[in-house]
Structures are given as C-alpha cells and as structure tokens.
C-alpha cells in the first residue's frame, strides 16, 4: 500500500488529474454552498420565497440533465483530449461576472425578464459547474485507467477541496 501511494505521487497524470479536480471542486464549493442562502436572504441576497428557489433549482436540474448528455456525447468523440474540459473551465471562470452583471439583475427584475434570467442562468451554471462535475469525474476516471492510478484516490481530492473551501467560506461569511 505504501509503495502504491508513493508511486502515485510520482505519476504526473495522477498529480494533474488530482490537482484539476481539486481546483474544480474548490471553485464550485466557494459559491454553491451559499447559493440557496443568496437566493432567499432578504438582507444580503435576493429575498426569494422557497417556491421561487425551488423553481430555480428545478430548472437548473433539468438543464444539467440535458447538458450532461451533450457533454457525454462530445467527450466520447474526443477520448482523453481535454478540449471540452478547457471549454468548461472557461465557462466556470465566467460564472462570477455573469452572476454579478447578468443573472442577479435579471432575477431581481421580475416578470418575463426574471424567467429569461432563470433559463439563461440554468444554462450557464449547469454548463460551467453542475454538468461539468460529471465530465471532470469521467475524464479523471479515464485518465486513471490509461495512466495507472487509483480513481478514488484522485477523486477524493475533489471532495477534500469542496469541504475545505466551504468550511473557510463559512467562517468568512
């Protein structure tokens, strides 16, 4: 067991995959753990009702299901190439400005603008994070088979990253 762990640290594919999934889950955990609170908090958030929050979560889930199938089909064609991962990373990097300058104003506008904002937000948030999670995990699993390291050990870094960032953000906010 000790030799397997020692050899994992010498495997550059393990290190890259572990670091990539760690950073992805860190970036997801910093905002997703507070998304519900942001939607419902009347003082520092949008002050939505539980029903409105549920609608947003439902539409996000539907968009995630559709985008996951699209990502899966595209990634099956790409094999182990990271082009789709780079695209998802770019979308994920744009989530902060999108929420600040597009999503929040549309959600607070009400009416048809709010509904369009919910739809647009479900596509962006799902494309960048919620559906992207499955792709990052699938790529890591493919790399683990191809380059000889334990997927579970690499995936654990993602869970660790999410937990650490959510804990730190909880203390800060």
Walk through the language-model features, giving the residues of each.
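Short hydrophobic/alpha-helical segments at membrane-entry points of transmembrane helices
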Residues: 16-17, 108-110, 114-122
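Cytoplasmic helix-loop-helix junction between adjacent transmembrane helices
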Residues: 121-157
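C-terminal ends and interior cores of transmembrane alpha-helices
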Residues: 90-111
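Cytoplasmic membrane-interface "Motif A"-like loop-to-helix N-cap segments
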Residues: 76-90
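Helix-loop boundary and gating motifs at the non-cytosolic
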Residues: 3-65
């Amino acid at each position: 067991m000790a030799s397997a762990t020692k050899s994992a640290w010498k495997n550059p594919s393990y290190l890259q995959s572990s670091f990539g999934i760690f950073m992805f889950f860190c970036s997801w955990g910093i905002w997703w753990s507070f998304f519900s609170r942001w939607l419902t908090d009347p003082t520092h958030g949008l002050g939505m009702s539980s029903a409105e929050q549920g609608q947003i979560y439902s539409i996000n889930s539907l968009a995630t299901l559709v985008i996951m199938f699209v990502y899966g089909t595209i990634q099956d064609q790409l094999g182990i190439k990271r082009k789709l991962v780079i695209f998802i990373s770019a979308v994920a990097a744009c989530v902060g400005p999108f929420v600040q300058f597009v999503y929040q104003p549309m959600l607070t506008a009400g009416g048809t603008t709010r509904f369009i904002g919910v739809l647009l937000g479900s596509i962006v948030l799902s494309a960048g994070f919620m559906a992207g999670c499955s792709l990052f995990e699938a790529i890591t699993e493919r790399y683990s088979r191809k380059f000889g390291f334990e997927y579970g050990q690499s995936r654990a870094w993602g869970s660790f990253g999410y937990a650490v960032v959510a804990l730190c953000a909880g203390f800060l906010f």
